[in-house]
Structures are given as C-alpha cells and as structure tokens.
Amino acid sequence: MLLGDMQDWKPNVASIIEYAADIYPESEVVSKLVSGQVHRTNYKEVCVRSRKLASKLVKDGYKQGDVIATLALNTFRHLEAYYGVSGMGAVVHTLNFRLHPEQAVYIINHAEDKVIFVEAPFVPILEALQENLSTVEKYIVFCDK
C-alpha cells in the first residue's frame, strides 16, 4: 500500500472530466445518437455542461449520497449525466434496458433511485413500471430541448 499521494489532487470521477477539459479541451467526443445522427463535442464542452447539470440538481434539492439513475445508451448526454451526477456527489446508478420488468422494479426500488434520466425510446419501459416505483421523484428525458 502506498501511503503518499501520487498526484496533488484527490482522484474521483468528476476529476477525470476536469483533467480532460484542462489538458485536452478541444479533443473530440463523438457519439451516435438514437436517431442515428453523429454528434460531436469536446471535453471542455462536456465538462461545462456536466457542471451545469450538477448545479441544477443541487438547486433542485438533491444532495450528496442521493441515488440518480440513467436508462440510456452511450451518448454525449449520458456522459454529461454521468459526470454531472457524480460531480455533485450523488451516486450514478446505470440501469439496463434489457432487464425483465420485475427485475427493474426491484433494482430501482432497492437502490432508492430518486431521479431517472431516460433516453426517449426507453420512456415506455418506465411508464409501464411507474406505479411500482416507490422512490422515484422525477424523470428527466434526454432530448434536444
């Protein structure tokens, strides 16, 4: 076990995007959207948008330790949510859209998810489960608006 720090900052998930935005701000982040379109951004923009999301979640009353889920594909929006949620100190709970409904209900309730970020094509999955989800306060759909 190493007793000394190898770097002058405490490593955590949010520090990864901070580092990337600082050292490689213009490096491209490319993702394919659900629509099939290719979206291009960069680490600096992902970091800025992740910070905005973190601030909004705190403003809405969510705090460190809360569990916030995502039901999404690997797009730039999911990446921003991942860094934004972890950046404000909440737990990111990634959900698998392939789960049987009973499994999904159990997992969401057991994790005590308070918010679920969801990709538009997966909204019907959550609509079917909604009345059985006891801890979810809010659903946020990833979209362009």
Can you say where each PLM-predicted feature lies in the sequence?
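Structural core segment of the AMP-binding/adenylate-forming
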Residues: 16-18, 59-60, 87-145
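Generic alpha-helical structural signal
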Residues: 14, 18, 47, 51-54, ...
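Short, contiguous strand/loop micro-motifs
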Residues: 3-5, 41, 68-69, 91, ...
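Conserved AMP-binding/adenylate-forming core of the ANL superfamily
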Residues: 29-75, 79-83, 100-105
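AMP-dependent adenylate-forming
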Residues: 16-41, 143
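Active-site-adjacent beta-strand anchor residues
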Residues: 10, 71, 116-119
